[in-house]
Structures are given as C-alpha cells and as structure tokens.
C-alpha cells in the first residue's frame, strides 16, 4: 500500500498501479488548489484517517529528529497513516523522508 502526500499527487499524471491511500488533509490540500485530477482518481484513491496512537508515535519521533517544526499537521498524518496500514510513503518532502527513515517506515521519493 502506498501512502501519498500532496507533493506526490501534485506531481503525478496518473496514480501508481499499486493500491494507494492518503489522509483527508491531502485531499483538502488538492481541493484548495482546484486540482481536477481528483475527479478522475476519486474511486481509485482510498482516503483514511490515522489513529491517535500512530500520531503520538510520529510526534515523538519528529521531536527527537528535530523535524517537528518543519512538518505540517497533514505531513504528520501521512506518516501516521503509513504506520496504520503498514504502507510505503511516497513524497518529495525531506522532513517526511527523514522521520520515516528514523521510524523504519518505508519511503520512496517522487520522481
């Protein structure tokens, strides 16, 4: 399962063939910028909330790594959702990649 952040979705013309999901905040960010690809991807992209327990783990790891101030709340939910679904994060955000690496969450760079 791929867990996509906003940067991954903004950079794609089509979704990966692998099953993909994202937190609701990512959808809100794309909607804010009137990205019409959501109209095409709506049925293919699973939208899921993360658990509070996973958010706590991400917050603690981000504090330890020094990335807490660089991660948006949506970034943190991407990482937490990856924990919940045992997924691989797809992003170009260095802070997300750094916290994912520290936490042992698989991560792939966009592009």
Name each model-derived stretch:
Residues 111:
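Cys/His-rich short segments
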Residues 1-87, 94-107:
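Active-site-proximal, substrate-binding regions of enzyme catalytic domains
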């Amino acid at each position: 399962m791929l867990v996509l952040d906003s940067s991954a979705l903004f950079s794609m013309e089509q979704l990966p063939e692998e099953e993909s999901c994202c937190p609701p905040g990512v959808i809100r960010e794309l909607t804010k910028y009137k990205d019409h690809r959501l109209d095409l991807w709506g049925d293919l992209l699973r939208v899921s909330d993360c658990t509070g327990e996973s958010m706590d783990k991400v917050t603690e790891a981000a504090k330890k790594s020094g990335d807490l101030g660089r991660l948006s709340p949506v970034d943190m939910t991407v990482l937490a959702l990856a924990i919940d679904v045992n997924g691989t994060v797809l992003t170009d955000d260095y802070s997300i990649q750094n916290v994912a690496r520290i936490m042992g969450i698989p991560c792939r760079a966009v592009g």
